[in-house]
């Protein structure tokens, strides 16, 4: 009877310790999600409103380039997800879906990384050109367009850093749910493997 009470008390103490450890991470997680929203929205706004007209070379818009369109869509999706996760963070039932939050944070970080890479490549080609395929740089003619695109990519990168940190925090929260094997269980398993009877204290 005492053994059962002791194991229950130990489990309760372990659970209380988990709550104490996780509390600061909850605050950091909320702060990162709040920061990610304006960064992603600003990236969308900066890119979606980006256009410039040149008397000689005509008009260029973000929608003319697939890498920029991809960045806009991904940032819009991650901003919406961040808002939803902030609103749901106050609900107790959300802890049941920690695995889902973990996977969504990982997916958001990956998508932001791919969108940053795609858009950064377009910006680089616009600024430097590609001599191997005889592409000239265009930022000397569309400087304002290139500048706004660069700002949008930088904001996207900042949102990416937020989600990279969120991925680590959500992973920590998920995997701390698993208790390490107790000493008594380890002794019992070892005794069974050696074929010896288990003597309980």
Curated annotation (Swiss-Prot):
Transmembrane segments: 27-47, 71-91, 99-119, 149-169
Domain of life, source organism: Eukaryota
Chief location of this protein within or outside the cell: membrane
Organism phylogeny: Eukaryota, Viridiplantae, Streptophyta, Embryophyta, Tracheophyta
Topological relation to the membrane, as annotated: Multi-pass membrane protein
Family, per entry: Belongs to the Casparian strip membrane proteins (CASP) family.
Protein name: CASP-like protein 2D1
A GO-annotated cellular component: plasma membrane
Organism encoding this protein: Oryza sativa subsp. japonica (Rice)
